[in-house]
């Protein structure tokens, strides 16, 4: 289930990137709540996911989205879509959840809700 939902998350990001061309090429990985050196240089803690948007120069984690394995075990398609919309907004708008970030997140999430209505989002599960 983890690998299936991880692939779904990657496909949702590709769908989002097809509409929002300024999104960077991104790597999406899963890891446990503890520090996992080969996957990420930080801990994910209780958050479902986090983004490495301002990684150190030449860091291998730049533009990486890390998702908690526990979340991937039970997340629905729309929960994954909402999380990807959230983290993708962090890759474009640096910093905290300010007004600019909120607007960008809403644009991402509205696009994905529209994709759900027309059946495009379900194809991300294949």
Residue spans of the language-model regions?
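Active-site-proximal or metal-binding-adjacent scaffold patches in catalytic folds
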Residues: 1-82, 91-126
């Amino acid at each position: 289930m983890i690998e299936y939902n991880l692939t779904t998350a990657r496909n949702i990001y590709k769908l989002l990137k097809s509409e929002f061309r300024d999104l960077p090429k991104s790597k999406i990985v899963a890891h446990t709540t503890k520090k996992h050196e080969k996957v990420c240089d930080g801990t994910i803690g209780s958050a479902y996911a986090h983004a490495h948007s301002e990684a150190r120069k030449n860091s291998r984690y730049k533009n990486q989205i890390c998702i908690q394995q526990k979340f991937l075990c039970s997340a629905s398609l729309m929960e994954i879509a909402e999380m990807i919309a959230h983290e993708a907004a962090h890759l474009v708008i640096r910093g905290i959840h300010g007004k600019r970030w909120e607007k960008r997140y809403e644009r991402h999430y509205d696009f994905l809700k529209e994709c759900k209505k027309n059946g495009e989002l379900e194809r991300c599960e294949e």
